[in-house]
Amino acid sequence: MPKIVVVGAVAGGATCASQIRRLDKESDIIIFEKDRDMSFANCALPYVIGEVVEDRRYALAYTPEKFYDRKQITVKTYHEVIAINDERQTVSVLNRKTNEQFEESYDKLILSPGASANSLGFESDITFTLRNLEDTDAIDQFIKANQVDKVLVVGAGYVSLEVLENLYERGLHPTLIHRSDKINKLMDADMNQPILDELDKREIPYRLNEEINAINGNEITFKSGKVEHYDMIIEGVGTHPNSKFIESSNIKLDRKGFIPVNDKFETNVPNIYAIGDIATSHYRHVDLPASVPLAWGAHRAASIVAEQIAGNDTIEFKGFLGNNIVKFFDYTFASVGVKPNELKQFDYKMVEVTQGAHANYYPGNSPLHLRVYYDTSNRQILRAAAVGKEGADKRIDVLSMAMMNQLTVDELTEFEVAYAPPYSHPKDLINMIGYKAK
């Protein structure tokens, strides 16, 4: 009976194991997870902190016991894979509760260890990061136990913005700092102005080009020379792949610690796959490498690997489009395609439209800003971005589908909109992009 070992039990690992079991009732499947919880919703964590998700149990899909009862898959939490011997096809496992080490053999190995939050490295009892449910519980308990009021949020990416919003909605008083003036880097810089407007509207302090120099108890000294007091600090300064344990194997890593994979999510070593935040692949619509550590990619990779292990040799990954979205108070920011800093590799033109998200005479209308970049050689879409209080998600998903099917910007005139006054226009923003491009 084949043995399948999975490293990591969150989005990629648990999903892949579950999909394998759906297709293969016989194989022995075991998952090693180094942390306390399995199969939790990473994307829910800021909303658990903000008490938007009122019961944290809603963010936890399975326990190991429930997973085994439903799927006959063994999950061992607090078990960390610390080394891989790909020649013997074994992994070395550390039981983090007992410090016992043992070896486990495999026929197929699926690596989905995820990523860890970067830290600024200050020794402080008031500093936290947010990556898993344990972090979420620690933050929530600290807030309650210490009557936290003033919170410093460091960083201005998706996680930091979501955390800041949820702290504010919880009734706390957050302040945002970021080490540069470039915030929310997946969006075009000039389309991020509503983030600052939303902060100003709520009188939430923020400082760009600012960093922490020292932490002494609750006293924070900044690069600017300011000295302020905070009850708590939450760092959102990026992540790094959990690939240290892979270095002793023959598995190839790139310079950033990611595992390059082929279109079957195979590594360079036979019988070993990599999925989720640790894997890097390529874009679907252009010939560039792409690392997209988001939920859709982990779930798609999990399904592809499961199909292959179950015997479908023809299924392949066609590449990322990098579709992403974030809510920040009243606004939605969404984009798809190459990153802003990758556009310089193309000869491109940009076309944009700003108009109401739905018919102007229908109540509640607000501006929606839609922007599309296209390749001048073939007029296919390279990137699109949308910002507004409504309708950004709808338009970016339509453009994602257009890119998936290699439509040109001109063909957007033929997009048949689902029109009624509360939703759109007879000639929608997407149509207008096509007309303006001509």
From Swiss-Prot:
Keywords: FAD, Flavoprotein, NADP, Oxidoreductase, Redox-active center. It catalyses: NADP(+) + 2 CoA = CoA-disulfide + NADPH + H(+). Its EC number is 1.8.1.14. Substrate binds at T15, Q19, R22, S39, N42, K71, H299, K427. The keyword Ribonucleoprotein does not apply. The active site is at C43 (nucleophile), C43 (redox-active). It comes from the Bacteria. Its cofactor is FAD. FAD binds at residues 8-33, 267-277, 419. NADP(+) binds at residues 151-166. It is an enzyme of class 1 (oxidoreductase). Binds 1 FAD per subunit. NCBIfam families: CoA_CoA_reduc (TIGR03385), PRK13512.1 (NF010037). Reduction of disulfides occurs by a thiol-disulfide exchange reaction, but involves only a single catalytic cysteine residue that forms a stable mixed disulfide with CoA during catalysis. Homodimer. Catalyzes specifically the NADPH-dependent reduction of coenzyme A disulfide. Contains 2 FAD binding domains and a single NADPH binding domain. This is Coenzyme A disulfide reductase.
